[in-house]
């Protein structure tokens, strides 16, 4: 669910992340559904919004003449029994010293606003229903039906309060008090704070790290353990452009990032569990895909909705064609994920090791082929350096696990292939004239994926060849305030895109490896300042306006915070320790 500062829930998919949106007015103000609560008189109104400390419970305060006149507290019930789904939204409305007229407006628009519901008044509220879906609103306020929505303008007395509850998948309603919303609120508060207390991190930028961890946690679909890259679809990478994608899937290359990040701050159980859940899905399908659905629905068909788009950005897409691409780096990602899981305390059993050996056999065959690589180019496949390096990194992880764990493996053969890949990249993927690695064989261009080379261990960060590469990336792809574009290459799509936030975190990791800690800290603080009022990030940012671009909130951006803050803390502590020796 996304709750805008004007009191509108303007995006929400129920009962699951990948279900057709019920609330989608962020993509089409006229057609899309919404659930709004706000002061009727919005003149001279200031709005503040924040999370209750160490929770994902959202508070929105409407302020006039310096005083809070109305507060809403929004949450979806959660508890330690996370596999039980609560497709409900509870909204607590309270006034303070003055009477306030409020507007409540409720319009679920099922199946991306393509199905017109039957609206029935029932005791305690209204129920909206189609052939397959039902959703109700329970409230003490007297709502009225008007065409495709129900609403009320209500005069609330000073220091009064009430609950308004939206429930998906129901056939009848109870009184609002019967839903025990206050008890659900306390349970949800306790759940989030208990989860947050399991973190072992207390270092630099602790509040941002924990907000990112909480944001990441809410992107998990508990019944299967899968995580969406973002809970939204078709929020544009450029206003008015066509780069509008559906991110409500699990990307296999994100797996290693998730495991490493969660384990870094103490969530080893979640890290190991995520890998096992991911492996369970892969084993059932007996193949590796670029992306996976969170509930095994396998609905990847990319299609366009008849929506106006966010700020006129069309087409509005759901589904994702990336599932059909060959992205060789994903094989390296899953092997590195298993290695990360092992370092986090997980067990590499015989089943997992058999899987690793199968992956190494595939990489041995595939690494020489062109692919679409990490940026999922929709143009002709090429020999991307990043995919070669990820193949090298897979062999590095497999060899290390075999040696450390005493596992049977053709280590000599693997080392020979690893060396072959390294020599191939150094011969065809490095340009002596510019003293830099290049995006793909035969190219003169750099791309930001090359920032990962030292992080993956392919080349030391202080090697002159990487320093030359980093200099070119700074000169050609850094745009403003430590923000980076992915590449300058024609990718077959019209229009421009914003700066990818994850790239800044890769850059910071490189600076840490170079022991340029002051520069790393400056870059991290710069990116922290770019978070929104809730401490959240999208995928990209418009470097000119500071506006967020792309889907939101974006897992990789928050994984970046979780990864680099502890690394920077550790590097500073090591420096202090050396000084004190």
From Swiss-Prot:
Record pathway: Glycan degradation; trehalose degradation; D-glucose from alpha,alpha-trehalose: step 1/1
InterPro entries: 6-hairpin_glycosidase_sf, 6hp_glycosidase-like_sf, GH15-like, Trehalase-like_N
Substrates-to-products reaction catalysed: alpha,alpha-trehalose + H2O = alpha-D-glucose + beta-D-glucose
Activity regulation field: Inhibited by validamycin A.
Keywords, sorted A to Z: Carbohydrate metabolism, Glycosidase, Hydrolase
EC number annotated for this UniProt entry: 3.2.1.28
SUPFAM superfamilies (alphabetical): Six-hairpin glycosidases
Top enzyme class: hydrolase
pH dependence: Optimum pH is 3.7. Active within a narrow range of acidic pH values (pH 3.2 to 3.9).
An example Gene Ontology molecular-function term: alpha,alpha-trehalase activity
Temperature notes for this entry: Optimum temperature is 50 degrees Celsius.
GO terms under biological process: trehalose catabolic process
Gene3D superfamilies linked to this entry: 1.50.10.10
Record bears the keyword S-adenosyl-L-methionine: no
Function noted in UniProt: Catalyzes the hydrolysis of alpha,alpha-trehalose into two molecules of D-glucose.
Subunit text: Monomer.
Record family assignment: Belongs to the glycosyl hydrolase 15 family.
Official protein name in the record: Trehalase
